[in-house]
Amino acid sequence: SGVAFQLPKLLGGKNVSPSEIENNIKTSPFIKEAIVIGDDRKFLSALIGIEYDIVSNWALRKNIAHTTYRNLSENEEVQNLIWEEIQKANEYTSSLQIRKFRMLTKELDHEDGDLTATQKAKRNVIMDKFSDLIEEMYK
């Protein structure tokens, strides 16, 4: 997950480690997973996985009905909450702003091949599996 990628259109070819940006985003208690996309793209985007129990408790306090990870992550108010959290992370990386994001509609799972044995996201697997979501951000 820490493999550096090039952001030539953003930074004049400077290599940036996506894990730095991802870790910054994951300081939010609401965000469990952040996969930053930027290789050969005009701007940075991210796939976000929520911290289900914490977001679920937040949603219950806001009277947001939900029964599954999917319908919680698809809820507009939850997406607004996550965007606010991304904006907070963006304040710390002024030249590397996440401009768009999409919510993962299921938790990443080691058994599905999404995570390593140490529970780290497998970037290439996730980028292949969620390529439709990624392409949607760059249309």
What residue spans do the PLM features occupy?
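Short capping micro-motif at the N-terminus of alpha-helices
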Residues: 18, 123-124
